[in-house]
Amino acid sequence: MTAGRVNPYSIVSSEEDGLRLTTMPGINGFGNGKIHTRRKCRNRFVKKNGQCNVEFTNMDDKPQRYIADMFTTCVDIRWRYMLLLFSLAFLVSWLLFGLIFWLIALIHGDLENPGGDDTFKPCVLQVNGFVAAFLFSIETQTTIGYGFRCVTEECPLAVFMVVVQSIVGCIIDSFMIGAIMAKMARPKKRAQTLLFSHNAVVAMRDGKLCLMWRVGNLRKSHIVEAHVRAQLIKPRITEEGEYIPLDQIDIDVGFDKGLDRIFLVSPITILHEINEDSPLFGISRQDLETDDFEIVVILEGMVEATAMTTQARSSYLASEILWGHRFEPVLFEEKNQYKVDYSHFHKTYEVPSTPRCSAKDLVENKFLLPSTNSFCYENELAFMSRDEDEEDDDSRGLDDLSPDNRHEFDRLQATIALDQRSYRRESEI
């Protein structure tokens, strides 16, 4: 079985140029009445990497609200800004308490008598200026304790400020460590190793028209209680004339039957049956080329290492849904284990037998389904693999024959008629 048999079944590239074909009537109705044009796709509500394409503006009291929830703000901001914020917090606290100690020394007269009078006892030893007071503040808050500068019992206010600075330093340290640990332990980055296919496909599955997309896990650690859900987002005008720019409609992926809960060890194809309850029930292949909607897909579960919930998101525009395609197989059995080849994860192949009409027309018997034994690419790969194994076994068996036995085998092979059934295509079997 040669590779030339699969040439009619093209592989679709995952790269999209952001444009799609639309149709419009021809001039004066001549010709086939269709002129192919290109128009720009709608803006995404959810980007392919899962980020929401939303910008908030004109928010009242935004800074005050963010400061009131300081911990969440520190966890959500970027690392560079968080480290800069804590560095500024430490620097401001050192400068503030350094200024306080300098003022205490100035009021007590420590700066006027740096060491000339042996009977004079300063509030803080070896603090003769602002720089020395600043260094004493750093040593106090960080508990370095070089030993040259220390507070005496001469000034109770200085002793009290040492206690206050120690407490403030502990609060800043605790807040910083907690924010850093919370930011590092967030399961958000776990979504970087959860993969969605670049395209969704529409094809027949068990005699029903279905929308399918593929999800995969790049890590060997499992996603516990993994489940999927999807929503269709498109503009809608209500019966009262109200325009809803982003109307969200749930897409059933088997919630009632428990099919939305998956065991994500190898890549899995998520399936949505296009039936009477589906928002895609009346959409045909031609409608898909001109329609304006977006399907947001969500994968949720708990990280096995931390038991924290993570969520991975992606979306498919109408131009990214391939009608009449199926995903290439990625799971193969090799020796005593299964092998997942992610080089085929995003690739699809065309299924010409897929009806072009909508599921609604299909239910109303407006389209005659092809034979259920139509050619299948996965079966072709399986047959190729089986035939190669059989050819290897046959070749090894022929090599073991003696010259006399080989001559007898060639003579019998030339006289015995071959079984024609073994040379028919799968669609004829």
Curated annotation (Swiss-Prot):
K(+) 2 binds at T143, I144. K(+) 1 binds at T143. It is a multi-pass membrane protein. Activated by phosphatidylinositol 4,5-bisphosphate (PtdIns(4,5)P2). PtdIns(4,5)P2 binding to the cytoplasmic side of the channel triggers a conformation change leading to channel opening. It is found in: Membrane; Cell membrane; Cell membrane, Sarcolemma, T-tubule. Residues 104-129, 147-155 are extracellular. Residues 130-146 dip into the membrane without crossing it. The keyword Lipid metabolism does not apply. InterPro entries: Ig_E-set, IRK_C, K_chnl_inward-rec_Kir, K_chnl_inward-rec_Kir2.2, K_chnl_inward-rec_Kir_cyto, K_chnl_inward-rec_Kir_N, Kir_TM. One of its GO terms (biological process) is protein homotetramerization. Residues 386-407 are annotated as: Disordered. K(+) 4 binds at G145, Y146. K(+) 3 binds at I144, G145. Keywords: Cell membrane, Disulfide bond, Ion channel, Ion transport, Membrane, Potassium, Potassium transport, Transmembrane, Transmembrane helix, Transport, Voltage-gated channel. The keyword Cell membrane applies. Residues 395-407 have a biased composition (Basic and acidic residues). Belongs to the inward rectifier-type potassium channel family. Homotetramer. This is ATP-sensitive inward rectifier potassium channel 12. It comes from Gallus gallus (Chicken).
